[in-house]
C-alpha cells in the first residue's frame, strides 16, 4: 500500500469519531436548507375579485296601513254646511247658563257627534273647488263628482278662522300654531302669561276622525276655511294697524306657517270679506277697499282665493257694480246662508252660486227638518251645556 493511500484512510477514520452525525439524504427528495421556511400547502388557484357590483337584495314588500279606497261617480245634490270655530271650553258660561256664543257655535262634543252622524248617513267630504269647472260656456256647476263607493258628497266650511282678540277668555282657543316640540296645535293665553295647548278645535278632531275612517275624505278633501283679515289670521296680527307695527312681519310669518300646514293636510281657503261687512250695506268704494285689503293682507298669507262667502249671508246679484268688482277681483263661486240647499249657474257663465246651512245652537234648535237628510239634530246637541 502506498504512502498516499494510507494517509487518506487515516483521515476518513478520524472524521467518523468527530461527533458529527451524518445526514442521510434520499435521492428522491431535494435538500431543504435550514434558513428557508417550509412553504404552505398549495391552496389551489384563486379567482381574481370581480369588478361587477353585487346585486342588492330584493326589499321585502311593505304592508300598507292605509286601506285602498275605490271611487265611483255621484250625480245628485251636494249639500254645503258650515260651522264657526269651536267652543273648546263649554264650561265657560254666560249669565243665562249657556255657553258663550251659544247661538253661533258648537262645541267639541257636538262636532264629534256631527262627524259620526254624517259618516253613519253615508256622507264624505269633498273639495268645493271640485264641484265647478270652466267650460266652453263659462263657469258651470259640475253635474257629477267622484266619491268613495257608496258615499254621498258634502261640502263643509268653517267661518272666521281668525281668532279675534276680543273673544279671548270666552271659551274659544286664541290661536293655532306649533308647540315647543313643533307639533301643530291650538293654544290659549292664560292670565299669568303662560300658554295652555289643546287639541279641542275642529282641525285636530277632524284629522283624528279621518285617520279612523279614511273614506270620509274623498280624494283627501278637507274643510274650506273662510278667512277675514280685519283682526288678523289664525290668532296673529297680520292686519295693518298702528298697534302691531313692530310685530307684524313676525306675525305674518307665523300665520303663513299655519296656512302651509292647513294646505298640506288638504284644507282650502275662501274669502269671507276683509272686514266682515254686510255687502249690501257697502258702497262701491267701500267694496273696492275691502277687496283691496283682501289682496294685500289676506292672500299673501293663505294664497289666491276664488270662492267668496258672504258675511252674514247677505248677497249681491249679477249686474250690481259691487258684484262686478268681486268678479274683477277673481271670485267665481259665491256662497250665502240659508235654511235650504241650492246650487245654480248664471247664464253669462261668469259666476256661480250656492247656499249653505250653518250648524250652530240656533240651527240645532230650529232647522231639524232641513238638516234631517244629513243627521238628527237631537243626536248632536249637547244638552248638558245648552238649555
Regions found by a protein language model. Name each.
Residues 1-5, 9:
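Positively charged n-region of N-terminal signal peptides that target proteins for export
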Residues 10-15:
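Hydrophobic core
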Residues 17-34:
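Sec-dependent signal peptide cleavage junction
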Residues 32-64:
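Ser/Thr/Gly/Pro-rich low-complexity, disordered linker/stalk segments of secreted
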Residues 60-128, 140-157, 163-168, 264, ...:
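C-terminal active-site subregion of NodB/CE4 polysaccharide deacetylases
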Residues 73-261, 265:
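Active-site beta->alpha N-cap acidic-glycine motif
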Residues 230-233, 275-278, 314-315:
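Short, catalytically relevant binding-site loops at active-site mouths
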